[in-house]
């Protein structure tokens, strides 16, 4: 399951997480099955959070590079 989660896109993981939450909210699953689905949901949540953090870090880096490039351009004009 862990390898499968790493290969999933963020959107796929989110869709699967939503499905698990819906199944758990129905409340008609046996305890063992509910626990298994809950564990899967937690793993997907962590994986998705990591993907979001990586995306945020990439955006921050790109914006910093752009700002740095703009600062250098402004310095050359003066």
Curated annotation (Swiss-Prot):
Keywords assigned by UniProt, alphabetized: Cytoplasm, Exonuclease, Hydrolase, Nuclease
Protein location: Cytoplasm
Catalytic activity: Exonucleolytic cleavage in either 5'- to 3'- or 3'- to 5'-direction to yield nucleoside 5'-phosphates
GO terms under cellular component: cytosol; exodeoxyribonuclease VII complex
Gene Ontology BP terms: DNA catabolic process
GO MF terms, alphabetically ordered: exodeoxyribonuclease VII activity
Primary location recorded for the protein, binned into one broad class: cytoplasm
Purpose of the protein: Bidirectionally degrades single-stranded DNA into large acid-insoluble oligonucleotides, which are then degraded further into small acid-soluble oligonucleotides.
Family: Belongs to the XseB family.
UniProt subunit comment: Heterooligomer composed of large and small subunits.
Identification of the protein by name: Exodeoxyribonuclease 7 small subunit
Organism, scientific name: Idiomarina loihiensis (strain ATCC BAA-735 / DSM 15497 / L2-TR)
Gene: xseB
